[in-house]
């Protein structure tokens, strides 16, 4: 029996090439817009920084506005750089997709999936009871650790000869420590 998803994908499989074309158009337009904004932001920030530097030196008593302006210029430079890197990344993704390497077939994806599976302990295999036992074992291991991460020292039993005098002295000291009631 075919699942509902496989029937759906077989029924609408003619749409997938159109979706790829739409993704290509959106990614190319987005990359061009990001690159254009990055050029404007980087150019404007660089010109403003070049113009404002001598003004900051000449009018040094105005430190608060100078700090604000410098912060804005630095954030403009960062925004331009980020937009530029985003645009370049989109273009590289388009080139990779045009070369026939999709994300599903990418060797980088396989590496990432294998790392995730290794960290999760096999990728979800096994029964719930086995996973519960593994978690409880880890908790017991953590509970047995001392403050410095070392195993907790085992408590040594007190010798019977030393424990007997202490047990006899304790009841005699208890009545003497009780406060007397005032009349």
From Swiss-Prot:
Name the InterPro entries for this protein.
Answer: Oleosin
UniProt xrefs under Pfam families: Oleosin (PF01277)
**Which protein are we looking at?**
Oleosin-B2
Q: According to the lineage, what is the superkingdom?
A: Eukaryota
Per the record, the similarity remark reads: Belongs to the oleosin family.
Signal peptide start-end: none
**What does the function comment of this entry state?**
Many of the major pollen coat proteins are derived from endoproteolytic cleavage of oleosin-like proteins.
User: Could you state one GO cellular component term attached to this entry?
Assistant: membrane
Region called Hydrophobic, residue ranges? 24-95
Chain segments annotated as transmembrane: 24-44, 46-66, 72-92
Any single GO BP term: reproductive structure development
User: What is the topology of this protein in the membrane according to its UniProt annotation?
Assistant: Multi-pass membrane protein
Entry keyword set? Lipid droplet, Membrane, Transmembrane, Transmembrane helix
UniProt subcellular location: Lipid droplet; Membrane
Q: Which Cys-Cys disulfides exist here?
A: none
Q: Where is this region: Polar?
A: 1-23
Keyword Membrane on entry: yes
Regarding tissue, the record states: The full-length protein is found in the tapetal lipid bodies of immature anthers, the proteolytically cleaved C-terminal product is found on the coats of pollen grains. Not present in seeds.
Encoding gene, per UniProt annotation: OlnB2
């Amino acid at each position: 029996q075919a699942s509902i998803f496989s029937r759906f994908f077989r029924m609408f499989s003619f749409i997938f090439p159109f979706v790829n074309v739409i993704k290509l158009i959106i990614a190319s337009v987005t990359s061009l817009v990001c690159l254009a904004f990055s050029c404007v932001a980087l150019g404007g920030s660089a010109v403003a920084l070049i113009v404002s530097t001598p003004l900051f030196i000449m009018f040094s008593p105005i430190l608060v506005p100078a700090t604000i302006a410098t912060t804005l210029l630095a954030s403009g430079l960062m925004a331009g750089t980020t937009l530029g890197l985003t645009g370049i990344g989109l273009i590289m993704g388009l080139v990779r997709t045009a070369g026939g390497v999709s994300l599903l077939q990418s060797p980088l994806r396989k590496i990432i999936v294998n790392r995730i599976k290794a960290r999760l302990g096999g990728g979800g295999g096994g029964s719930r009871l086995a996973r519960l036992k593994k978690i409880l074992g880890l908790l017991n291991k953590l509970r047995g650790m001392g403050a410095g991460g070392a195993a907790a020292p085992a408590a040594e039993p007190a010798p019977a000869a030393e424990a007997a005098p202490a047990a006899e002295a304790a009841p005699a000291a208890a009545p003497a420590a009780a406060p007397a009631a005032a009349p």
